[in-house]
Regions:
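Conserved phosphate-binding elements of NTP-dependent enzyme cores
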Residues: 1-956
Length: 956
């Protein structure tokens, strides 16, 4: 009998306090609780990790070494576990070859559709391409200049791996003498060794002819032989000219040929179909002249060319070579670059048009003479950028580069042959330019012949269902060519969700991390319906979520708490939603019932009368909109997913401000004009990226409080006696740290096909410092003891140290009292990292001219955490600064001073300003989707506020 519940006993991962619970299987289960309470530790680090570990354990030792091991979570027993799949918030891929189409596998089905039912059209004459007859091929070749030396070849292997020894042997037996392998002609009598792991092109040389009228018959026979050898393909070469003939597909007027239609022809990741200039990326990188020569009014000697700025007039070999080039073209090094002639600038950028004799002296005093072309600075940087293997050098060259659409394919990624094939009225690239909704409509109205319809039936069904799944999870505005790396965490997660639904698996345990993030309230119902459909297929869903609508729609809620960090890790409630609401000590239940809420501010701020006004913004889908950002207010930018919020704030507003403040490399999105930038002197972006990439980074080092703590220890009597300065108390430098583990506290032992093992350092026993350093104490505690304290404990410990206390207080105020000062930054959640950054900003003296930008800051935050976040944002605005937030969370939106609502829909149907004003004004707007849901939120808040305290609404 199948077990109907998931049994967990003795879970102690991270902050979990030996918890035991039963969760029903094949249900939609929501895990909730404060940020840092232990939800993720239970859902991902315990349940999913154990499911993954059991799968990996079932594989052979050989397979395990490629997968990397999975540690056994700290839990006594888990029973009733299904195969587990995790769908988390991580963005899909930053690989420029990864698109929405490839991630969802829709593009794979499209390639199949175009290969089996596509019709090639000549790009020059717009007529369908049909196979050429041998007579037509002969006529084409006979039109070439008489006396041409022809080589007729059969392309038998194209871009395939193998050593092909048997192939060469058969060709020898058949009497052939020569083959062309990877562009090089070889004799078959010689031993030809090929790397079987590399892809090769092999052409058999069928005949060599001098073109005359009397050789027509021989040409006909040779072409016939080549066509039979290479499945209807033949290559005729003369000098630099090489033409591919096909009895399959070629234009009868100009001879434009298309290879046999197969799926890989339509892949921009395969050499057969990819554009040969950009290799399928759609973009090329070249030197940005504005970056290379930022100020043309400067001369070369004044550092006008940034690349040579620091080596002008030195013995550097690069400078000696460049100075020779300048001398050859009579370039005056003291003349402004803008006054040089076109010929001189061309030589500086692209190099000499003739060999130049010159000599250079090495640093060792040796003299070398050369007579060669000298490379220009632009050509030099572009060549080295491609050739260098040093990441540091590549980074340096990259500072001069900018991306532009490929000059050959125009950003379409594919070669002319692949783009010539159409289904209906579109080639495969123009299909990917459509949004999900447009693509669905196009497929529904696609007209095919009876044969084509029969072939395409199954493929179209797969494409249609996958597009429908994307629409169901609220992503109907995405285009299939959208780069996966440009998706938000929520979008990426919902794409993976759509892919999973498309696989129609059952009996699986899905663990999801806040799928509602980045989704407008309007689209929430569709997402919930999707999750229920997955459950109804016979799957178990565990969803880490804070969205109230999702919680109320769940079959079961597990509430972890009561607080965060050391104050959490317990099961507060475990049952249906109504049971959680009735649980007195459940903070989640109190917010669901309305006993606790986020109140409305007592009044909406009037601002400081200044604003930043943008006119004619038209980046991505923005429709030449005019937007006013009032300063000195809490400004919310809202709208359905894909309406253009991130484009307006991050691409246009933020980059325009950064450029005005001197960030040279930043290129703002397109707009006509902007005014009011003089009212801002600083911009701070507070995102959810980690505060550090290494385990050495922690909240104490990031906020700067660790410097002050080290000052305190350096001032202790013992430290003074020993002559220790503050550097002695750093675990990053030699002196005070334990050298056995270099201040890490642990050692990593590689176990080959087993996971790496982390063992405490046997010298310092995990304490990071050497014994002498730890002997210096302050109030009975050494530096390691302080790093092990929580923010809350440290506040009391350093009560008489105002500098330290102030910094710790800001961490406490943003709700991070439970964090250890020395907790590794890599273990912090996105929400925690963001609040550490906020705390760090709160410590700084307000300028009144600073603008803070936050993109969906409520990700990973419980309603109680959101309450704290709003209080912090209000504090920042109270000090005279401006905060601009992109957000869907109604609790944040209702507390705004000013809202800019975009829409009406996502993608092409968005990009317009629907409404601006206070929350009350937006709620009253008939065309605003945000307004409809905001009105309900405002009414609910007011009703519950009156019920609680007799009618007052106050600022938290």
């Amino acid at each position: 009998m199948e077990q109907d519940k998931l049994i967990i006993r003795g879970a102690r991962e991270n902050n979990l306090k030996n918890i035991s619970l039963d969760i029903p299987r094949n249900k939609l289960v929501v895990m909730t609780g404060l940020s840092g309470s232990g939800k993720t530790s239970l859902a991902f680090d315990t349940i999913y990790a154990e499911g993954q570990r059991r799968y990996v354990e079932s594989l052979s030792a050989y397979a395990r070494q490629f997968l990397g091991g999975v540690d056994k979570p700290n839990v006594e027993l888990i029973e009733g576990l299904s195969p587990a799949i995790s769908i988390d918030q991580k963005t899909t891929s930053n690989n420029p070859r990864s698109t929405v189409g490839t991630v969802t596998e829709i593009y794979d089905y499209l390639r199949l559709l175009y290969a089996r039912t596509g019709v090639p059209y000549c790009p020059n004459h717009n007529i369908p391409i049909t196979g050429q007859t041998i007579t037509e091929m002969v006529s084409t070749v006979m039109s070439w200049p008489e006396g041409s030396r022809l080589t007729i070849m059969a392309p038998i292997i194209r871009n395939k791996k193998g050593a092909y020894k048997d192939t060469f042997e058969k060709l020898r037996r058949d009497g052939y003498v020569r083959v062309r392998v990877d562009g090089e002609v070889k004799m078959l009598e010689d031993e030809i060794e090929l790397d079987k792991n590399r892809k090769h092109d092999i052409d058999v040389v069928v005949d060599r002819i001098i073109l005359r009228e009397e050789s027509r018959g021989r040409l006909h026979d040779s072409l016939e032989t080549a066509l039979s050898l290479a499945n209807g393909m033949a290559v005729v070469m003369t000098g630099d000219r090489e033409e591919l003939f096909s009895s399959n597909y070629a234009c009868r007027i100009c001879g434009f040929s298309v290879p046999k239609l197969e799926p890989r022809l339509f892949s921009f990741n395969a050499p057969l179909g990819a554009c040969d200039v950009c290799h399928g990326l759609g973009i090329t990188e070249e030197v940005d002249l504005d970056s290379l020569i930022p100020d043309p009014s400067k001369s070369i000697r004044q550092g006008g060319i940034r690349y040579y700025k620091n080596i002008v007039d030195t013995e550097n070999i690069e400078w000696q070579t460049f100075a020779t080039l300048c001398k050859a073209y009579k370039v005056d090094l003291d003349k402004p670059l803008k006054d040089l002639t076109k010929t001189q600038m061309h030589a500086i950028l692209y190099g000499s048009d003739r060999p130049i004799a010159y000599s250079i002296t090495s640093s060792g005093g040796n003299k070398y003479t050369r007579n060669d072309y000298i490379e220009g600075v632009k050509s030099l940087i572009e060549r080295r950028y491609v050739e260098t293997t040093s990441s540091m050098s590549k980074e340096w060259y990259h500072t001069f580069m900018f991306e532009s659409p490929c000059p050959k394919c125009g950003g379409r990624r594919l070669n002319e042959q692949a783009l010539s094939v159409r289904v209906g009225d579109r080639n495969i690239h123009s299909f990917t330019l459509m949004s999900v909704v447009q693509a669905l409509d196009w497929i529904d109205h696609l007209e095919l012949t009876e044969t084509q319809a029969q072939i395409a039936d199954m493929v179209l069904k797969e494409i249609r269902s996958r597009l429908q799944f994307l629409k169901d999870v609220g992503l109907e505005y995405l285009t299939l060519d959208r780069l996966a790396g440009t998706l938000s965490g929520g979008e990426a997660q919902r794409i993976r969700l759509a892919t999973q639904i498309g696989s129609h698996l059952s009996g699986v345990l899905y663990v999801l991390d806040e799928p509602s993030i980045g989704l407008h309230q309007r689209d929430n119902a569709r997402l919930i319906r999707t999750l229920k459909n997955m459950r109804d297929l016979g799957n178990s869903l565990i969803v880490v979520e804070h969205d109230e609508e999702t919680m109320m729609s769940a079959d079961w809620i597990v509430d972890i708490g009561p607080g965060a960090g050391i104050h959490g890790g317990e099961v507060i409630a475990n049952g249906p939603p109504e049971e959680v609401i009735a649980t007195e000590n459940s903070i989640t239940g109190q917010y669901l019932s309305g006993k606790q809420l986020i109140p409305l501010p007592a009044e909406r701020r009037k601002g400081n009368s200044h604003s930043v006004d943008i006119t004619g913004a038209e980046e991505h889908n923005l429709k030449k909109i005019n937007v006013k950002f009032p300063l000195g207010k809490l400004v919310l930018v809202t709208g359905v997913s894909g309406s253009g919020k991130s484009t307006l704030v991050n691409e246009v507003f933020m980059k325009a401000v950064q450029q005005n403040l001197g960030r040279a490399k930043v290129k703002p999105g397109k707009f006509k004009k902007i005014k009011g930038l003089e009212n801002l002197d600083k911009l701070v972006q507070i995102d959810q990226d980690p505060i550090g990439r290494t385990p050495r980074s922690n909240p104490a080092t990031y906020t700067g409080v660790f410097d002050d703590i080290r000052d305190v220890f350096a001032a202790t009597p013992e430290a003074k006696l020993r002559g220790y300065d503050k550097g002695r108390f750093s675990f990053n430098v030699k002196g005070g740290r334990c050298e056995a583990c270099q201040g890490d506290g642990v050692k990593v032992i590689s176990m080959n096909f087993l996971p790496d093992v982390y063992v405490p350092c046997e010298v310092c026993h995990g304490r990071r410092y050497n014994e002498e350093t730890l002997q210096c104490t302050f109030k009975g505690k050494n530096i390691y003891d302080v790093l092990e304290m929580t923010v809350e404990e440290a506040l009391g410990f350093f009560a008489n140290q105002p500098k330290i206390r102030t910094k710790l207080q800001t961490l406490y105020d943003v709700g991070l009292g439970y964090l250890k000062l020395g907790q590794s930054s890599t273990t912090l959640s996105g929400g925690e990292a963001q609040r550490v950054k906020l705390a760090s900003e709160l410590q700084k003296r307000p300028t009144g001219k600073t603008v803070y930008i936050l993109d969906e800051p409520t990700t990973g935050l419980h309603t109680d955490d959101v309450k704290r976040l709003i209080a912090v944002l209000q504090r920042i605005v109270d000090s005279g600064n401006t905060v601009i937030v992109i957000e869907h969370n109604l609790d944040v939106i209702k507390c705004a001073d000013w809202i800019i609502d975009l829409g009406p829909e996502g993608g092409d149907a968005g990009g317009q300003v629907i409404a601006v004003g206070t929350p009350e004004q937006i709620a009253a707007h008939p065309d605003s989707w945000t307004g409809q849901y905001l009105k309900k939120a405002l009414d609910w808040t007011r009703a519950h506020t009156r019920a609680e305290d007799g009618g007052t609404t106050c600022q938290d």
